[in-house]
Regions:
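Nucleotidyltransferase catalytic core that binds NTPs
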Residues: 1-179
Length: 179
């Protein structure tokens, strides 16, 4: 199935049929700003839990409220396009709220997946999914991968001017393109 960016209503229509046909719908969500291998492995694990993987994506406005000024680094449409291009992802739904509760309560996936950094009792949508007969699964985090850590590394290595502050190895020199 080709991945698509859908509205919540489109996803309910499209994947409601899949559920009626016995296909298991899996849902996960996040900001997914600066996608890294930890995210990819999480999507792959989530996809293995069912037949269809839908990713809820925080809008730019909700990311700013959650993460602060300067975020997201990648605009929502571009983040959605990147996610939709992944083989493991069947659809992407952008949502404006701070949490995906409304999306989850309307979509009612068979499986709700979150990263292992979320305590089980704090996973938004848990009650709705379990009340509808679904289950909630925490997937393990991949060590050494974090968007916040990547951003910190960038900040430490580059000053406000964008020039690399780290010393260059001896003998290295910057080159300029010819005019």
């Amino acid at each position: 199935m080709n991945s698509a960016n859908l509205t919540l209503e489109q996803a309910i229509l499209r994947f409601g049929r899949d559920k009626r046909d016995g296909r298991r719908v899996v849902f996960t969500n996040g900001c997914f700003d600066l996608l890294h291998p930890g995210h990819l492995r999480g999507f792959e694990l989530a996809r293995e839990l069912g037949d269809v993987l839908i990713v809820g994506l925080n809008s730019d406005a909700s990311v700013r409220q959650l993460k602060g000024p300067g975020r997201p680094v990648i605009p929502e449409r571009e983040r959605a396009e990147i996610l939709a291009a992944l083989e493991s992802v069947d659809a992407v739904i952008i949502f404006d709220e701070l949490t995906p509760r409304q999306v989850i309560s309307r979509l009612l996936p068979d499986v709700l997946v979150k990263g292992g950094d979320w305590p089980g009792d704090q996973i938004v949508g848990r009650e709705e999914v379990e009340a509808a007969g679904g289950r909630v699964v925490s997937v393990p985090l991949v060590p050494d991968y974090s968007t916040s850590a990547i951003l910190q590394k960038i900040r430490e290595g580059f000053g406000p001017s964008g020039v690399n502050k780290k010393p260059q190895p001896e003998g290295a020199r910057a080159t300029r393109p010819e005019s």
